[in-house]
């Protein structure tokens, strides 16, 4: 039962093969047995079972919706009433929010049962989930490897079937890269599609929440509940609600032959995503996935995203600048860690922040403060914003000749734990294919498409699918067609 997808679990609940309480108990036992993975930072069985009992009551009345009674885990960047909300930081180690984030509230309103809070890189700053104040997360496929970051706890939980689904956030790739590393499906929606209210902020113009699950169809179900306008989020976009499952299982164009359901689909392949730096085993898996798409009727079209290489310096100017502002609120006065011993007020600020923040967070705050300082603002921050607009324009030019863009989610498979901690630049380079999508505000997702070679044979590879603004339903259709023809997303780590 634990290996079933959300769609399959929904059918099991409808057929009364299990109850919501039994499902919750099953996953709670699995979470407890897999503590070594360190995927969860906070679990409260009483709270979980209370929600499950309420869901069973709804189902018994013949009420409830598509998600009622189904379990989910939440990345610990979403504040939750009743559970601690830490953002992976000592600064918030004991913080309990008086309210739920909109994402959490909407999923609970849809009847989902919260299993707990998942581990993450501190304040979502990292690509390996080694920056958490609560310890590194291990990749269920190979426990010597990282699970990706910053949503590494969520990706590990879904991969190890400790939860059938989880929420994540993506600022520069933090849903797509860990989904790739852990062999699960994850989607970053268009910026503004999902409310950021109650999401502890890293970089406000980039942060976006999204679902992680076994399949594209599961992600579509979750996105139905998560998305929508929220007046409490000034960046939330007011659009008509839509059903993200509406194209699943349908041909790309009416009248397509059953054997070629994607005939007419044009897949753009950026030259810049297949150059130097792409590992051979990742390239082989991506090439095989693209051949599968051709077999389904799609056409491959070369495109260019010439500013791809600039996405890293642009991101690491803009994101730290916004982080330095957002994290200024954590001063030991209003909430968060406060130093036990200090002199005057200024000394209390300094010591509280020095003790509460980890090394990577401090590094990015310093970088952000520097690029915003007098004499450097124009040279760095404003220049980065100008290039950001050009990056978005490059995508729009590419979409004139294709419907979706594809390539690797990461240039390599997951690396060994501890292997890149001393070289942050190498860690930053791992996000080369995801950063530009975030800078442009476009939707993107990762779907499992293979494994690495030889020594990396247990480490998954993810195919990134990028859509135009608000084109998530079509993007999910394209991913779903691939998953109907392959079984990469159904494979599980040994022992699971």
Curated annotation (Swiss-Prot):
Active site (record annotation): 75 (charge relay system), 150 (charge relay system), 174 (acyl-ester intermediate)
GO BP terms, alphabetized: translation
PROSITE patterns linked to this entry: AMIDASES
Signal peptide (from-to): none
Top-level enzyme category: ligase
Family: Belongs to the amidase family. GatA subfamily.
Task performed by this protein: Allows the formation of correctly charged Gln-tRNA(Gln) through the transamidation of misacylated Glu-tRNA(Gln) in organisms which lack glutaminyl-tRNA synthetase. The reaction takes place in the presence of glutamine and ATP through an activated gamma-phospho-Glu-tRNA(Gln).
Subunit-level organization: Heterotrimer of A, B and C subunits.
Protein name (database record): Glutamyl-tRNA(Gln) amidotransferase subunit A
Lineage: Bacteria, Pseudomonadati, Pseudomonadota, Betaproteobacteria, Burkholderiales
């Amino acid at each position: 039962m634990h290996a079933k997808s959300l769609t399959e679990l929904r059918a099991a609940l409808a057929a009364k093969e299990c109850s919501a309480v039994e499902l919750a108990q099953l996953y709670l036992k699995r979470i407890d047995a897999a503590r070594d993975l360190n995927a969860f930072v906070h679990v409260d069985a009483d709270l979980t079972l209370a929600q499950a009992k309420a869901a069973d009551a709804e189902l018994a009345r013949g009420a409830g919706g598509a998600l009622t009674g189904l379990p989910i885990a939440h990345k610990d960047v979403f504040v939750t009433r009743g559970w601690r909300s830490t953002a992976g930081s000592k600064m918030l180690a004991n913080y309990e929010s008086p309210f739920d984030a909109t994402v959490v509230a909407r999923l609970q309103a849809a009847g989902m049962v919260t299993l707990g809070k998942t581990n993450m890189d501190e304040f979502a700053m990292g690509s390996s989930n080694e920056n958490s104040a609560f310890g590194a997360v291990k990749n269920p496929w190979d426990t010597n490897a990282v699970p990706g970051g910053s949503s590494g706890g969520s990706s590990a939980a879904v991969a190890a079937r400790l939860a059938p689904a989880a929420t994540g956030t993506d600022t520069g790739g933090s849903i797509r890269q860990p989904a790739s590393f852990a062999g699960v499906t994850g989607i970053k929606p268009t910026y503004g599609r999902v409310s950021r209210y109650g999401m502890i902020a890293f970089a406000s113009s980039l942060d976006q929440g999204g679902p992680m699950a076994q399949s594209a169809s599961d992600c579509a179900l979750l996105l139905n509940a998560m998305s929508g306008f929220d007046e409490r989020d000034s960046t939330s976009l007011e659009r008509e609600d839509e059903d993200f499952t509406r194209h699943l299982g349908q041909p790309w164009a009416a009248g397509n032959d059953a054997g070629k359901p994607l005939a007419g689909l044009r897949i753009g392949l950026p030259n810049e995503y297949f150059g130097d730096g792409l590992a051979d085993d990742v390239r082989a898996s991506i090439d095989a996935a693209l051949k599968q798409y051709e077999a389904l009727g799609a056409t491959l079209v070369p495109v260019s995203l010439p500013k791809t290489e600039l996405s890293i310096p642009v991101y690491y100017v803009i994101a730290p600048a916004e982080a330095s502002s957002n994290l200024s609120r954590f001063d030991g006065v209003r909430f968060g860690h406060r130093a036990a011993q200090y002199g005057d007020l200024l000394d209390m600020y300094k010591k509280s922040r020095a003790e509460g923040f980890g090394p990577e967070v401090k590094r990015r705050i310093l970088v952000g403060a520097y690029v915003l300082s007098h004499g450097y603002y124009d040279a760095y921050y404003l220049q980065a914003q100008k290039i950001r607009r050009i990056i978005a324009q490059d995508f729009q030019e590419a979409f004139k000749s294709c419907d979706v863009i594809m390539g690797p989610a990461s240039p390599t498979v997951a690396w060994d734990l501890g292997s890149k901690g001393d070289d942050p630049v190498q860690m930053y380079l791992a996000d080369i294919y995801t950063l530009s999508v975030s800078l442009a505000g476009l939707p993107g997702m990762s779907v499992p498409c293979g494994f690495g070679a030889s020594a990396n044979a247990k480490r998954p590879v993810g195919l990134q699918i990028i859509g135009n603004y608000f084109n998530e339903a079509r993007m999910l259709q394209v991913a779903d067609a691939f998953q109907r023809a392959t079984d990469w997303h159904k494979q599980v780590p040994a022992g699971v």
